[in-house]
Design a protein with these regions (language model features):
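Polar, enzyme-active/binding microenvironments
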Residues: 1-90
Length: 90
């Protein structure tokens, strides 16, 4: 996904159970970290919320999308496979 620099996009992601790598994980408390333009990973500012059926969302801040280049997201939680995604900030 392409993200415009300085915007506040909402990122939606699915977490699955690490026990079978396919069952949607509900009731988790995910930690989301980002790497901006090749920098070190750091926690996102806003809280992550569960939508339903293993889907979660987090809204990035304008500061978090302020650097052009690769924006890597990593979501982890107890008993789930890590979720990773790469976006391009332009």
């Amino acid at each position: 996904m392409q993200i415009t620099s300085g915007t506040t996009p909402t990122i939606v992601f699915l977490l699955v159970s690490s026990s079978d790598d396919k069952t949607a994980l509900t009731g988790a408390t995910p930690t989301v970290t980002i790497s901006k333009a090749g920098g070190s990973f750091a926690a996102v500012t806003n809280a992550v919320s569960e939508i339903s059926s293993g889907f979660y969302k987090v809204t990035l801040t304008a500061l978090e999308t302020g650097s052009t280049g690769a924006l890597i997201l990593l979501a982890t939680a107890t008993s789930c496979d890590p979720w990773r995604d790469i976006h391009q900030v332009v």
